[in-house]
């Protein structure tokens, strides 16, 4: 039996000391594909390094997690995102979306960045991986407003 882990952040420092064993164990257990959603520019390099080390098993995505959408850093995050899309191959745009669980005051900026990332997914013909907490109706409105038949993806949260 073969399985796909559709959402794992194995590139984070918590796995640094035993990542090779974790991936070996996953493969031996039948989990042969590991999909790696990005968080923000701080995780891109480690994610890409892991996918290069295990090109048959680890597949990177690129995106800005809604909890990483901050007024003071969003311009540099967007520049990084667009540069990465030009320079690398990604499975999807993700993990993107809206998250009001921790902080509700950034909703309008999260909505703007979520919309922009969906537009990039449409432009690059990539599916999206959506993260939503306590903002499902708002997220659906954005997706419906864009109304694009080319858009596909999954909700992870």
Placement of each model-derived feature along the sequence:
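Mid-domain alpha/beta scaffold segments of enzyme catalytic cores
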Residues: 1-157
């Amino acid at each position: 039996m073969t399985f796909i882990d559709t959402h794992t952040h194995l590139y984070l420092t918590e796995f640094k000391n035993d990542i090779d064993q974790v991936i070996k164990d996953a493969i031996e257990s039948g989990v042969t594909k590991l999909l790696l959603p990005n968080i923000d520019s701080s995780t891109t390099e480690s994610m890409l390094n892991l996918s290069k080390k295990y090109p048959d098993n680890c597949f990177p995505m690129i995106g800005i997690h809604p909890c990483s959408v901050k007024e003071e850093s969003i311009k540099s995050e967007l520049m990084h995102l667009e540069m990465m899309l030009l320079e690398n191959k990604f499975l999807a745009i993700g993990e993107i979306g809206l998250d009001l669980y921790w902080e509700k005051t950034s909703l309008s900026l999260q909505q703007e960045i979520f919309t922009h990332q969906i537009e990039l997914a449409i432009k690059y013909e990539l599916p999206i991986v959506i993260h939503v907490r306590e903002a499902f109706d708002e997220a659906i409105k954005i997706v419906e407003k864009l109304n694009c038949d080319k858009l596909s993806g999954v909700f992870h949260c």
